[in-house]
Regions:
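N-proximal low-complexity "stem/linker" segments adjacent to membrane-targeting elements
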Residues: 88-141
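Short acidic donor-binding/metal-coordinating loop in glycosyltransferase active sites
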Residues: 156, 181-182, 208-209, 217
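Catalytic-site signature of metal-activated, phosphate-bearing donor transferases
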Residues: 188-190, 215-380
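A short, glycine-/small-residue-rich helix N-cap motif at loop->alpha-helix starts
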Residues: 182-188
Length: 380
């Protein structure tokens, strides 16, 4: 199946492949079969049009999964809006960056303090969600208390009571829920938010509903960002939490229930998510990585340049992104099952994903539980 798939893809060029990799011609294998069995593992490109290194560097989950890049692109990447080469990426960037003159004028007029012009939000948040009602109120309350003024939630066919759970935030104009049906909509949703909000917010945070960004100290996120305004983005490292020995979904808040994390040097902790200045961002390429406009770049908490979706080391002395990937074992099982419906590739339960061998205690999020619970109960 995969052999026929890549032959029909338009990105496997048999003559080009044989000309550039003579060992394939002498292998006794059909060119496509050689690429699938041996070539891609050696870093061979299927054609000039499909850039092997670009694809793996831009979408690190492909490398982690050990999947042939071209097969991944045809089975999953294409419908997710992934790019097979840098040329197509930059073509999309050009199309994305044509904001209307009126929006630009309003933004800069507000920045100058001209009368009668609504001031843009300082910090907004965009996320795509599906069936997150049991957790979403805690998450929204947490970020609202930490300086997020406006939430743009892309609802990917939720079947729960999302709008009811957030009704007070919606009525107050703090949360806007945007219908976003279909599969593989994460990156398209982020780019829609980038286009919508380029001149409506100073900063745009792009995170998932299981991620909580925490400043170490007394500052809100919005206050912490003041020192980074000359940069295109602040890239924040993950801190990965496991199930903490909980087999069933517990009572209480996510912030207080989970207290064990991967050790500092685990590669999962090297991934970043970013708070971006949307006027300096050309395109969201994947959930962990944006392309920036002419000379602009992201930095970490120490003002060190960050290139790509991962960092060389985890840096979380000032700010971190707690990632409650699995929660309890019961919830992890349900998450794996949900993932199957949105992917050609089979995801299975792996003990190392929910019970970390290198787990250490970490409870920095606990201090937020009281204020968050209070806001959840009283509302806005």
């Amino acid at each position: 199946d995969d052999e026929r798939l890549i032959e029909k893809s338009g990105y496997f060029r048999e003559k080009w492949y044989l000309r550039n990799y003579p060992e394939a011609a002498g292998s006794g294998l059909a060119p496509a079969r050689h690429y699938l069995q041996e070539g891609w593992k050696k870093g061979f490109r299927p054609s000039m049009q499909f850039d092997y290194e670009f694809y793996l560097n831009t979408y690190p989950e492909v490398n982690e999964a050990g999947i042939c890049p071209l097969v991944h692109y045809e089975r999953e990447g294409r419908r997710k809006g992934y790019f097979p080469n840098a040329r197509q990426l930059y073509k999309s960037i050009w199309k994305q960056n044509r904001a209307g003159f009126a929006d630009r004028l309003k933004f800069w007029a507000a920045k100058l303090g001209l009368p009668g012009v609504k001031k843009p939000a300082y910090l907004s948040l965009a996320a795509i969600i599906k069936n997150e009602a049991p957790y979403i109120r805690e998450w929204v309350c947490f970020y609202y208390l930490n300086g997020v003024e406006k939430f743009y939630l892309y609802d990917n066919e939720s079947e729960d009571n999302l709008r009811e759970v957030l009704s007070d935030f919606v009525s107050a104009g703090i949360v806007e829920i945007i219908n976003c049906p279909g599969k593989a909509k994460q990156v398209p949703a982020y780019n829609d938010a980038l286009s919508r909000l380029r001149y409506k917010t100073q900063w745009l945070m792009i995170v998932d509903a299981d991620e909580f960004m925490i400043v170490n100290g007394n500052k809100k996120i919005s206050e912490f960002l003041k020192d980074y305004e000359k940069y295109a983005a602040l890239a924040v490292n993950w801190v990965m939490y496991d199930y903490g020995g909980l087999l069933k979904k517990p009572e209480g808040l996510v912030l207080e229930n989970y207290r064990t994390v991967h050790g500092k040097f685990h590669p999962k902790n090297l991934h970043v998510k970013s708070v971006i200045n949307p006027r300096k961002v050309a395109l969201c390429v994947n959930p962990h990585y944006c392309e920036y406009k002419g000379g602009n770049y992201a930095v970490n908490e120490n003002f060190e340049k960050v290139v790509g979706p991962v960092t060389a080391v985890q840096s979380i002395d000032k700010i971190r992104l707690n990632h409650y990937y699995c929660k309890s074992y019961e919830e992890y099982e349900a998450k794996v099952a949900r993932g199957l419906a949105d992917s050609y590739f089979k995801y299975t339960i792996k003990k190392e994903d929910y019970a970390f061998d290198d787990a250490t205690e970490d409870y920095v999020a606990g201090r937020f539980a009281g204020p968050v619970r209070s806001l959840m109960e009283k509302g806005v």
